[in-house]
């Protein structure tokens, strides 16, 4: 197995196996994080607006792998094309909508994994890896990593109403047409924010947004 390749299936595979899932009596499909992310586990979100083309659909695959010995991800031009090319991103979202629609046609429900306490160091907001054109990037040492992990920047909701509004928009977006997801599983929900008071406030607003 090539360590630089992703492991596992994709959304087309789920779509192809719908008959099998229905025959098993499956009533709910719960997906681990599906959004753009450089890892296999995808709890380090890079872009909340799009399904990762590696598990969605790649229609443009230009560029090169990161050269051996090169440690700067801005030179991984094939990865950058895969996850920033609008054709790939939009095709992946469309495929996900098809998966949800087919699940609903079979009376199955679909749950997404929401990772909103932290994002990933590849995230387009901070672009630590310098893979987005014209992004401002970040000041070194200017963020706190969740549980000390520098690849998992903790989101500072108290310091940004814009951030809170955007994440609530994301939450609503995926439960609305054309995606129509049935609900969210919320990762490390109790850790979000910097106080219990704000944590409760945020999730109350989240609930209002998705109802």
What is the predicted role of each segment?
Residues 1-211:
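Active-site and adjacent substrate-binding regions of carbohydrate-active enzymes
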């Amino acid at each position: 197995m090539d360590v630089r390749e992703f492991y596992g299936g994709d959304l087309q595979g789920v779509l192809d196996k719908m008959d099998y899932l229905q025959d098993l009596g499956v009533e709910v499909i719960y997906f681990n994080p599906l959004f753009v992310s450089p890892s296999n586990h995808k709890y380090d979100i890079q872009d909340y607006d799009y399904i990762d083309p590696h598990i969605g659909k790649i229609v443009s695959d230009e560029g090169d792998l990161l050269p051996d010995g090169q440690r700067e991800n801005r030179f991984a031009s094939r990865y950058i094309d895969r996850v920033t090319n609008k054709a790939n991103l939009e095709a992946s979202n469309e495929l996900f909508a098809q998966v949800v629609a087919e699940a609903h046609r079979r009376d199955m429900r679909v749950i997404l994994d929401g990772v909103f306490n932290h994002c990933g160091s590849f995230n387009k907001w901070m672009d630590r890896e310098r893979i987005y054109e014209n992004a401002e990037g970040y000041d070194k040492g200017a963020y706190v990593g969740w549980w000390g992990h520098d690849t998992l920047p903790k989101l500072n909701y108290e310091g940004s109403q814009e951030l809170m509004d955007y994440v609530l928009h994301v939450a609503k977006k995926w439960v609305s047409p054309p995606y129509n997801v049935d609900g969210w599983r919320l990762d490390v929900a109790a850790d979000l924010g910097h106080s219990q008071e704000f944590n409760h406030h945020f999730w109350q607003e989240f609930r209002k947004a998705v109802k």
